[in-house]
């Protein structure tokens, strides 16, 4: 049971049916009751949220609305642990720009959501503080790495949440949990205050109960930021402006490669249902090709792990974070601190990243992966010369069982095969629920050219409304 959308609570607050403090208290009570079964939240501070609620300005776009926040986005005075022992006792001294903008819009950051450690994972199983569970079936994964954000929204213990998306970490758990998840164009949302995994791929975005709420959150957090050198100077927009518009004549491409990679029958049925629905709304759906689709996973993991190897080198026991208590020299300090502080998946990716950047292997792996990335971007440029949007599965299968012993690491990595391309090319993408009643949640993904979020949200909203 969902807690109620942003739009719903804005009306309730405006009409005096509830106060911001009452909303925080009701949400906190739901969190206390439901979180033990889901492990969606790592912590929350009800007292601090109530203090903010007492000063809420209901005339602001998100006035009095609590928003959950992934544990890798800095909130001043709040633990920012990245679900890792390495940062278990770290308290952020400042707000991320996205948080500052939420506050400026009147929202109340409330609750730190669980995640795969340092955003490395596709299942929500890699947290140092225990796995997150899927509200649809607590024996299954919620997806990752924004596992807690997705589970909190789907489980009725968050109105909306922020996550981060490096290779699908917003859209993939949104699909598995049956909610909306959106990755904006790279640079749309400032990365200042987001703990880096792979800097050329990371992007903050919303996980929400519906498309309208995603647009409302984007309105608050988007815009240029001088503190982020990769921040776009593209003017901010009203992302709700085209919601409810007719999409007749919209040209939508369906990549043939996305239909030939062994999708689960439920996923194939969801895509077919979306195609029929969009066609019924007057959109024109045609087959297209993305020739390098099968190379994206290898390219992504080489690039992302290389960047992670560099970004995570700062966690060495000297400046901040975990520091080993075992005496020894400087080399021992580094190695023991990192061995104790990082989990297995993080170690695996740091080792891989160091390897592909090392002498003799840079050209063989990293440089080739970057060339594939350029080819993927060119594939999309060619496709968007023919169509306005691209439709496909968000993930190849519904949510697997937690700690499924039959799944190999490679199969786990392949779960992101449809979401990774948007990160490599820097495109906006959104996952919209499209499941049959009685079945596990699954979603379909819509992609658009750079900075076409407003049009993308319009099509996603039309699809969402028609599917209801």
Give residue spans per PLM region.
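Structural helix-boundary/capping segments
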Residues: 14, 33, 155-160, 166-261, ...
